[in-house]
Curated annotation (Swiss-Prot):
It catalyses: tRNA(Ile) + L-isoleucine + ATP = L-isoleucyl-tRNA(Ile) + AMP + diphosphate. The gene is ileS. Pfam families: Anticodon_1 (PF08264), DUF5915 (PF19302), tRNA-synt_1 (PF00133). Signal peptide: none annotated. One of its GO terms (molecular function) is isoleucine-tRNA ligase activity. A motif ('KMSKS' region) lies at residues 594-598. GO terms for biological process: isoleucyl-tRNA aminoacylation. It comes from Borreliella burgdorferi (strain ATCC 35210 / DSM 4680 / CIP 102532 / B31) (Borrelia burgdorferi). This is Isoleucine--tRNA ligase. Keywords: Aminoacyl-tRNA synthetase, ATP-binding, Cytoplasm, Ligase, Metal-binding, Nucleotide-binding, Protein biosynthesis, Zinc. Its main location: cytoplasm.
Length: 1042
């Protein structure tokens, strides 16, 4: 026997009850244990940082990461789900710096690296309990107890093994290179870390500087937007094919050289200068000039202070001449190619000038701009000063401007394996698919060598020891290897401990570790190996869990985790690290901005869950464009709408079934037969079996959008067609076979639908299942197998028939709404136009249903529209414009004059001739735009190949019937307001008026049947509610139980 179900459910409370049920009965653990020994489905969980609380952006991938493993478990596979934590790196260090009130490398070293790392270890798992509570409350099943942490010694050791493998393959090298650098973090960043940050519009000073050509009284006008790089100037670049002009400036009385195209930008008056000569940039190549600062004069003998040609120089901005300093990637490349200059980097770890540039010592580079400009102006080198608005990258962790500078770093040689990376990408199933060739594929095509070292403290140390005497390098791949070489016991692999480990070399020197730590992205990319402590343990099983069958994260990870996984998987095994990936977009606030606590532009996620329930939030996110890697403007109202339009209708269907099943004491049979006689039963069973087929196909393809759409379509069919059209079968008093078939069918449909929905909305499905399950059923809905389609009960013919009837009904309802004809007001006739003979036959079979649904008395089927409308035509300028030219206007006029019969001929395929002047033109249907004019009293609508019309003339008899239907509806509402049971018989009290008399004379039996009224009584004292039957017709009613 089923328990009674309340019409109004408190879904958050239900979810908390279900969480307790899962925990008390260890349902998650049982779901995994029952699949032990089955085919494994491998899932990698990308590790988040636990230094902040989860937000809506985390909820999307976490919902996806719950849906797929639940589904695959129900498909009979063994799916381990262990959570992971990213515990190293810049985010953690930055939090500790804020906590301690210190900043930068020097202050950390003064505080003590060991003390600093202890603080990092304390803070790194600050919010793990909050994460655990929120993720579990979202309904995600994941094992936090067996989760991995990147700071675990076992994890760190496997990362060393990965590093050594790459080192031995020649894929690791150390070099100076111009890299993006965070001054506040005092470390270089990788290119993809730069892309994780924000590019802001900034106003930088734009300078034009005079550089004097050696031994001549002539000046090169050189342009720059980075004044702070000028003290390190080592060269000048021009475009080889750009034309330059040597001019005499009459005002300054100086000879100047600049791009010819830029003369108008620098001189308003052509008479203020004289052109001496014009020449290509190639003529300037090799010319020496006098440096504007004397800090690095010793570099002159190594090729500094000369003009070079470069492809990147243009005349789009500035003068067409730019200065070269080793702070730009292209600049650095040209200096390496054409000179032997030393690597110049007069900046300390925080990007302040060192003593090498004594005039500006101690100044942060951006702050030094003003002083440098003053210096140049004072010494008459400044020709022009302006401001330049451009986009500039800012550090994704500290929000400070990124500085590009030459710095020693360790690299993965990505260029060397680029071809293989592209091959590996072809093996990956991307969802959405466009990312394969698009965002991710393009990123791989342009991939640069990956700077993996960080000049920081809390991270996995680069396992390379270097001989202090010879420079010989030894790369360590395990803890044991280091113990054997050093003769010391190793307890921890972090920098503060491992840097103490040294040993003598045979050459009389000492092996000392290189000071850097690894980029934390290297660790997350090594997660498939390190989380399993491969190859030190689990070596046999590893082949079964690599590559992953599935991963999921946000779009930003195409340049983050997806990228590093792919690089390391390719470098180690020439294989992808994952076979399938679902990529979600960004979750923004409702105003389209980034969600921010300071902006206060979003609701606390737990408040949303506690208001609407986790199921509603999950469904809202999965239904949205965010699952297709598009952005979502999050709205609480969107979650509310999902609750109202999807979750509650599911509950209502369940409530409807249990209400009547309890009344009739329905008990589901042990062997429920799907062979039914009623067409509605056959149809909903067929639709359900078809749905199973779609879901098994689409979820296997990781197409959650199509899966959800199919589920929602079925929910609509179940509620708004099957149940609505079957109500009378449940209402009737006799328990015949048809009624029992209706119970069995609805029971089967709801229970099966819950199992199909279970991976998506795990709470409400469990709640409903617990009331519907029999003694033979599994303890939890999530312990079931995912339903497979029974092809024997898929009946496409009956699906087509009823779906056609539903389409006609939908069109008719739209037409009524458009012309303000209420659905309870009967109409005399519906006209349906289709040329398709099969559709005509199906419509005849469905006539009774269609008439009932649209509240019409008669249905007429036509093959042509002409009986409903007359045609008018306008010229289709898009089509005709291509072929008519100057005759277009005249032909357009003639088209507007076409008669109805002429247009019908064109519709039927006849080519229609129009004469304009001496030319003949022939019109086809594509050349005209049809306009339909309805005939008198008809309202017409067209959708694809079907046109329908309704007779809008409402006779007195029809009007009275419409009022009666509205009268019944108002009585039903009053029953609900008074919490009457659906089976309660009533006395109906009415007042004495002419309208009610007419209604009762004609429709008394109908009113009694629909409202379960045994008696209709005139009694003023019992009247309790005033109701509105039409615009100006009111009456009073009252009801009481018999």
């Amino acid at each position: 026997m089923f328990k009674k179900v309340e019409n109004k459910a408190n879904f958050p409370k239900i979810e908390e009850k279900i969480l307790k049920f899962w925990n008390d009965n260890k349902i998650f653990e049982k779901s995994i244990k029952q699949r032990e020994g089955c085919e494994e489905f491998t899932f990698y969980d990308g590790p988040p940082f636990a230094t902040g609380l989860p937000h809506f952006g985390h909820f999307v991938p976490n919902t996806i990461k719950d849906i797929i493993p639940r589904y695959q478990t129900m498909q009979g596979k063994y799916v381990k789900r262990n959570f992971g934590w990213d515990t190293h790196g810049l985010p953690v260090e930055y939090e500790v710096e804020k906590k301690l009130g210190i900043s930068g490398k020097y202050e950390i070293e003064n505080y003590g690296i060991e003390n600093f790392n202890k603080e990092c270890r304390k803070i790194v798992l600050r919010y793990t309990e909050e994460w655990k509570n929120i993720i579990l409350r979202l309904g995600r099943w994941v094992d936090f107890e067996k989760g991995y942490k990147t700071m675990d010694i076992s994890f760190m050791e496997s990362v060393w093994w990965v590093f050594k493998n790459l080192y031995e393959k020649g894929l690791i090298y150390e070099s100076y290179y111009v890299l993006p650098y965070s001054p506040k973090l005092a470390t270089p960043l990788s290119n993809f870390e730069v892309n994780l940050g924000e590019y802001k519009e900034v106003n930088d000073p734009s300078l034009t500087i005079k550089f004097k050509i050696k031994d001549k009284n002539e000046y090169l006008l050189v342009w720059t937007t980075t004044p702070w790089t000028l003290p390190s100037n080592l060269g000048i670049a021009v475009g080889q094919e750009i034309e330059y002009s040597k001019i005499f400036d009459k005002t300054k009385e100086e000879i100047l050289i600049l791009g010819s195209k830029k003369l108008n930008s620098y001189y308003d008056d052509e008479n203020s200068y004289t052109i001496i000569e014009k020449f290509k940039g190639s003529k300037l190549e090799g010319i020496e000039y006098e440096p504007i600062f004397n800090y690095f004069l010793e570099q002159k003998d190594k090729g500094a202070f000369k003009v070079h040609t470069a492809d990147y120089v243009t005349t789009d901005d500035g003068t067409g001449i730019v200065h070269i300093a080793p702070f730009g990637e292209e600049d650095y490349r040209i200096l390496k190619k054409h000179t032997n200059v030393d690597i110049i980097d007069p900046l300390d770890a925080e990007c302040k000038f060192t003593n090498q540039v004594k005039d500006f010592k101690g100044l942060f580079v951006k702050d030094a701009d003003k002083k440098i400009i003053e210096n140049l102006k004072l010494r008459n080198f400044l020709f022009k000063r302006e401001n330049y608005l451009h986009r500039y990258p800012f550090c994704y962790r500290t929000n400070c401007p990124i500085i590009y500078r030459p710095i020693s770093s360790w690299f993965v040689n990505v260029e060397k394996i680029k071809t293989k990376l592209l091959e590996v990408n072809e093996k990956i199933n991307w969802m959405p698919a466009h990312l394969k060739k698009g965002r991710f594929g393009k990123w791989l095509e342009n991939a640069k060598d990956w700077a993996i070292s960080r000049n920081r403290f809390w991270g996995n140390p680069i396992p390379i020891w270097i001989c202090s005497k010879t420079g010989k390098k030894i790369c360590i791949g395990s803890k044991k290897e280091l113990e054997n070489l050093s003769g010391q016991k190793i307890e921890d692999l972090h920098k503060d401990q491992i840097d103490k480990i040294t040993w003598p070399s045979k050459d009389g020197g000492k092996f000392i570790r290189t000071s850097e730590v690894l980029d934390c992205w290297f660790e997350s990319g090594a997660m498939p190996y390190a989380s399993n402590h491969y190859p030190f343990t689990n070596e046999i099983n590893f082949k079964n869990i690599f590559p992953a069958d599935f991963i999921a994260e946000g779009l930003d990870q195409t340049r983050g985790w997806f990228y590093t996984l792919t690089i390391l998987g390719t470098a180690l095994f020439e294989n992808t690290a994952f076979k399938n990936v679902i990529v979600n977009g960004l979750v923004l606030s409702s105003d389209g901005r980034k969600m921010s606590k300071s902006f206060k532009n979003y609701t606390d996620p737990m408040q949303v869950i506690n208001t609407f329930g986790a199921d509603a939030l999950r469904l809202y996110l999965i239904m949205s464009p965010v699952v297709k890697a598009d952005d979502l403007k999050y709205s609480d109202n969107g979650v509310r709408d999902v609750l109202k339009n999807i979750i509650i209708p599911i509950w209502n269907a369940y409530s409807f079934f249990t209400t009547y099943a309890i009344i009739d004491k329905f008990k589901p049979p042990k062997n429920l037969s799907l062979a039914k006689n009623n067409n509605l039963d056959k149809w909903i069973i067929s639709e359900l079996e078809s749905l199973k087929k779609i879901l098994n196909t689409e979820i296997d393809k990781y197409n959650l959008t199509k899966s959800i759409e199919s589920l929602l379509e079925f929910i609509d069919k179940l509620n708004n067609w099957y149940i609505r059209r079957s109500r009378r079968r449940f209402w009737k008093s006799e328990n015949d076979k048809d009624k029992n078939d209706a119970y069995e069918t609805l029971y089967y449909a709801i229970k099966t639908l819950m199992i199909l929905l279970a991976p998506f909305i795990p709470f409400i499905t469990e709640e409903i299942y617990q009331n519907l399950k029999t003694d033979e059923d599994k303890q939890s809905i999530h312990l079931n197998d995912y339903p497979k389609a029974n092809e024997n009960f898929i009946n496409k013919t009956i699906e087509e028939k009823i779906n056609l009837a539903r389409k006609i009904t939908s069109m008719a309802r739209s037409l009524r709404s458009l012309h303000n004809i209420k659905i309870r007001m009967p109409i005399s006739t519906i006209y349906i136009v289709t040329k398709n003979q099969n559709e005509q036959n199906m419509l005849m079979e469905m006539q009774e249903i269609i008439l009932d649904e649209i509240n019409a008395k008669e249905m007429k089927i036509k093959a042509n529209e002409e009986e409903l409308i007359t045609y008018k035509a306008k010229a289709n300028f898009k089509e005709l414009g291509k072929k008519l030219g100057k005759d277009m206007k005249a032909v357009s006029t003639e088209i507007s004059k076409l008669k109805n019969e002429d247009i019908i001929k064109i519709i039927n395929g006849t080519s229609y001739e129009i004469k304009v002047a001496n030319a003949k033109h022939y019109l086809s249907l594509n050349d005209i735009i049809l306009e339909r004019e309805e005939k008198e009293n008809l309202k017409v609508i067209n959708e694809e190949s079907i046109t329908i019309g309704i007779d809008s003339l409402i006779t007195k008899e029809l009007y009275l019937e419409g009022l009666t239907r509205e009268f019944v509806r108002q009585i039903q509402n009053l029953r609900k307001e008074k919490n009457f049971d659906v089976s309660d018989r009533i006395n109906l009290y009415i007042e004495n008026n002419e309208t009610l008399k007419e209604m009762l004379n004609k429709f008394e039996k109908y009113i009694k049947t629909e409202t379960l009224a045994l008696n209709i009584i005139l009694n003023k004292s019992k009247l309790e509610k005033k109701i509105n039957l039409a615009d100006d017709i009111f009456t009073l009613i009252g009801i009481e139980k018999c």
